[in-house]
């Protein structure tokens, strides 16, 4: 099944893209939960975090570098939240792995 993120990656759906490289696309969330709310999306289809295997773990390291870059570019490097919703019970609504980067204000505690 094709997800909205795959359609965005293919260019079939418009988005507010802020970064793209060989392995990732970063877009502004359509329904932001913070002043800065970005989605870091691997181009390779991986349904959820629990499904990562083998060399795909390297994508997590690359995502970490992109998160740092985006935090600097958006002026939130002094405080931000990184979230991955994993599976239906974890609140995942689009079943293509993606990482939320939220910041730009005082974020309330969630734990």
Swiss-Prot record:
<dbReference type="InterPro" id="IPR011146">
    <property type="entry name" value="HIT-like"/>
</dbReference>
<dbReference type="InterPro" id="IPR001310">
    <property type="entry name" value="Histidine_triad_HIT"/>
</dbReference>
<dbReference type="InterPro" id="IPR036265">
    <property type="entry name" value="HIT-like_sf"/>
</dbReference>
<feature type="short sequence motif" description="Histidine triad motif">
    <location>
        <begin position="96"/>
        <end position="100"/>
    </location>
</feature>
<dbReference type="Pfam" id="PF11969">
    <property type="entry name" value="DcpS_C"/>
</dbReference>
<dbReference type="GO" id="GO:0005737">
    <property type="term" value="C:cytoplasm"/>
</dbReference>
<dbReference type="GO" id="GO:0016787">
    <property type="term" value="F:hydrolase activity"/>
</dbReference>
<dbReference type="InterPro" id="IPR019808">
    <property type="entry name" value="Histidine_triad_CS"/>
</dbReference>
<protein>
    <recommendedName>
        <fullName>Uncharacterized HIT-like protein CT_385</fullName>
    </recommendedName>
</protein>
<feature type="domain" description="HIT">
    <location>
        <begin position="4"/>
        <end position="111"/>
    </location>
</feature>
